[in-house]
């Protein structure tokens, strides 16, 4: 089994415990998992003891989760999962994520699973693409849940990356740590393809919205975004595909 790094930002160890425990207890191959936390301040001595007892866990003190922070925490794992304290995992989740990555209708090595994971009380219970809702006059792109993938046979390619969830080869982190700018545009320019996960193998205790993104008019990738998804920043218009998320 290939090694998987689970990356998570949390206020403290207590906030992360339930999600990490859910990931570990429901994994088919627990020994293939390693864990990395980004914390706003150093843990207390009792917290460090609990973290050490949990298993292969390391941490970094940083005010925010950035790709540079992720790269620092990476220790050679082949795959990386950006996780959130609100996540809860179903049985054999890592096997299912790997299968979904292989099922992406793009080159496996360049695919990135993402999307709005469903909340546990969601009546539909499907993953939704990250879709464009509108472009404000100041160049701010606002996001919304796209069309739920209730019957999709495989992950669906799309333009946008959820900032709290992705699963990909670890090379994605290393590539994204270089450079700056809007994450989904940087991924697009570098040849990575975001794909909405088609099976809800992870659910959430509450919905995680995608914050608006202020896009600079000179950012790389805007022409490609317009051509492939009909999101036109110059005109401030969105295509049907942009509003669906795929």
Spans of model-derived segments:
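Catalytic cores of eukaryotic secretory-pathway lumenal/extracellular enzymes that build
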Residues: 2-246
């Amino acid at each position: 089994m290939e090694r998987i790094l689970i990356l998570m930002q949390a206020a403290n160890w207590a906030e992360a415990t339930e999600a990490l425990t859910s990931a570990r207890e429901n994994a088919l191959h627990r020994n293939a998992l390693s864990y990395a936390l980004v914390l706003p301040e150093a843990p207390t001595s009792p917290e460090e003891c609990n973290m050490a007892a949990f298993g292969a866990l390391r941490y970094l003190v940083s005010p925010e989760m950035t790709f540079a922070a992720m790269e620092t925490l990476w220790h050679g794992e082949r795959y990386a999962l950006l996780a959130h304290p609100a996540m809860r995992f179903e049985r054999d989740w890592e096997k299912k994520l790997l299968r979904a990555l292989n099922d992406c209708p793009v080159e496996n090595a360049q695919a990135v699973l993402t999307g709005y994971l469903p909340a546990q009380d969601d009546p539909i219970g499907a993953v939704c693409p990250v879709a464009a809702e509108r472009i404000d006059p100041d160049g701010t792109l606002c996001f919304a849940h796209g069309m739920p993938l209730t019957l999709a046979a495989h992950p669906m390619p799309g333009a946008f990356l959820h900032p709290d969830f992705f699963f990909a080869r670890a090379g994605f982190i290393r590539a994204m740590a270089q450079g700056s700018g809007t994450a989904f545009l940087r991924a697009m320019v570098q040849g990575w393809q975001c794909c909405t996960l088609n099976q809800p193998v992870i659910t959430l205790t509450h919905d995680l919205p995608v914050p608006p993104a202020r896009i600079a008019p000179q950012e790389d990738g805007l022409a490609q975004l317009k051509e492939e998804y009909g999101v036109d920043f110059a005109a401030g218009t969105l295509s049907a595909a942009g509003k669906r998320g795929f």
